[in-house]
């Protein structure tokens, strides 16, 4: 058995494909970010007052997944921090991962060298300590809140309001914010007081086109792959497939990396187009699984309801039909159902993450209705649901 492990490790160490695959990972930030020069210039100009130890304007950054928002913000802050040594501190928090008000405040405190218990303090006490920490720090602090839309939808904007009030309670030291979101309409959800305070500057990141993605992939490929293993047509195909899906650079890099890994597993010396299509299928399967495993329980029940209806002939999945099926599932499991309005919201959320499709259609004299369908393979959904909770196996059988 250990021979198998040794064989795998040996083939990994002596890869015929990669020099260093880390250059293809989404959290790698290169020395240059092509096709984002305008955004880099604008963010840097907004943050330039940090050089004089003055508070810059707050920024909201919008753009679809994989358009370079997080990479550009980290890139600019890193460069400015080196040039403005000691004049400011920057803190990055992904609020989808650090996903409670307690942990957000605790992380901010720890970034200012204030230790707090993992739990046990009130939000009011954490806030009081944060105000004191900012006052004691004595320099500017830039707080980056990534994926902030998911956090606000879950907990409302109370924490943002609290954070926006800190500057009124301190003197020299000030906090400024950079909010990053995939949702262009997110700012409309905010309390007007929070909106006026935090969205002083707004920057939109457009999707990359196929040519830009090809350029990005070519630069990364030169660092990641061994010479001669990656034909130009493979890079073009990865760029074209990612451009078709709203110009997602992260998707393009994943396609290229996984294509190389498949070539490696096949013990091939070149990456082929067929491996790109295999990579596309593998990535989609993993993406759907990861989303479903982290869904709230009632979102999984709604998804199961849509799957059940899609298996029936001549039945259209409307919101009403989905809700009726959802109620039956809740009854079978002995759980209390949520309202039809909440189920409608869940359907929209599953549409946004690409698991369902929900489109409004005009049915003549019957008026408009929303038709709901599956955006991904049904079998992948069912397997993922069963993996997340064994009770779904009984519902499907």
Swiss-Prot record:
Induction: (Microbial infection) At least 4-fold induced following infection by Sulfolobus turreted icosahedral virus 1 (STIV-1) in strain 2-2-12. Keywords: ATP-binding, DNA replication, DNA-binding, Nucleotide-binding. It holds the Pfam family Cdc6_C. ATP binds at residues 67-71, 208, 220. Autophosphorylated in vitro. It comes from the Archaea. GO terms for molecular function: ATP binding; ATP hydrolysis activity; DNA binding. SMART domains: AAA, Cdc6_C. GO terms for biological process: DNA replication. Monomer. Interacts with Cdc6-3, MCM and PolB1. Involved in regulation of DNA replication. May play essential roles in origin recognition and cell cycle control of replication. Binds to DNA, with a preference for molecules that contain a bubble, a fork, or a tail. Inhibits the binding of the MCM helicase to the origin DNA and strongly inhibits its DNA helicase activity. Also regulates the DNA polymerase and the nuclease activities of PolB1. Stimulates the DNA-binding activity of Cdc6-3. NCBIfam families: orc1/cdc6 family replication initiation protein. Belongs to the CDC6/cdc18 family. Strain 2-2-12 is a substrain of P2 that is highly susceptible to infection by Sulfolobus turreted icosahedral virus 1 (STIV-1). This is ORC1-type DNA replication protein 1. The lineage of its organism: Archaea, Thermoproteota, Thermoprotei, Sulfolobales, Sulfolobaceae.
